[in-house]
Amino acid sequence: MKTSPLPLPPDVRAAAEDILGHDGIREEFAWMSWAGTVWRLNGERGTLFLKRAADLEGERARLVWLDGRWPVPRTAGFFHELGDDWLLTHPVPGVPMSDKSLGWEPDRVARSLGAFLRELHATDAVGCPFGVAKPGNVLIHGDYCLPNVLVENGLLSGLVDVGLSGLGDPETDLAAGVWTLSYIYGPGFARRFLEAYGWPPMSDAAIEKLRRKYSR
């Protein structure tokens, strides 16, 4: 996986400059995950995010469909250059729930993560072209971990890395939530997350089995 976007392909740079201005773009590494590498592009007229990965067509299509349904980034450009896909997006407000600057206690993080997910899974997904429509399936995020959920003023404000979203088993997102809370805060907060979501009570062994369903 590439750790630097430089040099930016000409078409990518031109698209970014059309939005940010031609007075120089400053590239800043943002994060890296299994889904790709992301940079923050800063210019005189604002900020864009640039993701680079082998295949981002699915994520681009999902961002278009989810726009207006979930608080996802708006697409600013999509390119295939140098053997990879390059996805330009506008920023969404808020900070990731994994960010210490949020200042929340783990209990509040866990309960908010569960409450947000309950709302997301209640989204009307009629006509969703991704995943499988069958009884019990809902519109899932697909990688519902703390870094991918943004909040502002105590409310859900953004969702990123939606390349696996679509109709699916709600346990997919529940497993990711249990895993991310255990990874960042240790055991003990998964139950609060599940309670806030409204999931039936589970034994410790069942929660651990659910956690193990998450794999990235």
Name what the model sees in each region.
Residues 35-36, 47-87, 99-119:
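A conserved alpha-helical element in kinase catalytic cores
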Residues 40-44, 90-91, 152:
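Active-site beta-strand termini and strand-to-loop segments that position acidic
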Residues 87-95:
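Short pocket-lining segment of the protein kinase catalytic domain that shapes the ATP-binding cleft
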Residues 138-140, 152-202:
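Active-site Asp-x-Gly
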Residues 143, 148:
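Conserved catalytic-loop position in the HRD/HxD motif
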